[in-house]
Amino acid sequence: MKKVITRENPTVEEVKELLDIAEKHGGVVTIFARCRVYYEGRAKSELGEGDRIVIIKPDGSFLIHQNKKREPVNWQPPGSKVSMRENSIISIRRKPHERLEVELMEVYAVTVFLAEDYEELALTGSEAEMAKLIFENPNVIEEGFKPMFREKQIKHGIVDIMGLDKDGNIVVLELKRRKADLHAVSQLKRYVDSLKEEYGEKVRGILVAPSLTEGAKKLLEKEGLEFRKLEPPKNNDNKREVKQKTLDFFTPC
């Protein structure tokens, strides 16, 4: 079988056929289509008609991208189940129950890529080494801090490190290898606000960097966020993997 199978302007039946091939052989599906998107779960949302890219991976990951921004506008995590009913592709996550439906108005092209990739990402660079140091010695942040995640996708971006403090509060760390600026503070605030929407007020945000600009310091104080001074480690030995738990470990505060 070919590594890449492509159909331009496919019918609904051809789309379903390619989804079946991808499921059977572990292929990555990319769909270029005009569609509507409906989400039901912890909340409800609807995205009107527009041109989008839909990506379905063998592990159940389901991503919908617009023609802007890095992050998907809607997504489902690995382990979700994908099916097709009439002209809609549906992704179901069981726990917590979430349903994402893509109603296809017009399909421009579908590609199935039978990818083989068995490698794990080996992070390098100062911020990766800072993260490794924090996981190995959490007390550099504060006594009783317990890091749980690294590079964790949440609704509004990817959190560098997420964990719990000694009182059970969720703690978000934003790491910067150089002097942190206003943008770093705004990014941290966005992550904290996103998690507060889901888990309540007991969420802390800590900016971790060698130093701060004066503007960043003032904004941190204004937003009720914190700062920890930490220099990036000098060595580059960063081969040990850090085990992570799922976000479902946390319970709403």
Curated annotation (Swiss-Prot):
What UniProt keywords apply to this chain's record, in alphabetical order? Cytoplasm, DNA-binding, Endonuclease, Hydrolase, Nuclease
Q: Which InterPro entries match?
A: Endonuclease_NucS, NucS_C, NucS_N, NucS_N_sf, tRNA_endonuc-like_dom_sf
Offer an example of a GO molecular function term for this protein.
single-stranded DNA endodeoxyribonuclease activity
Locations listed in the record: Cytoplasm
Summarize the protein's role.
Answer: Cleaves both 3' and 5' ssDNA extremities of branched DNA structures.
Which family is this protein grouped under?
A: Belongs to the NucS endonuclease family.
**What's the name of the protein?**
Endonuclease NucS
Could you tell me the gene encoding this protein?
nucS
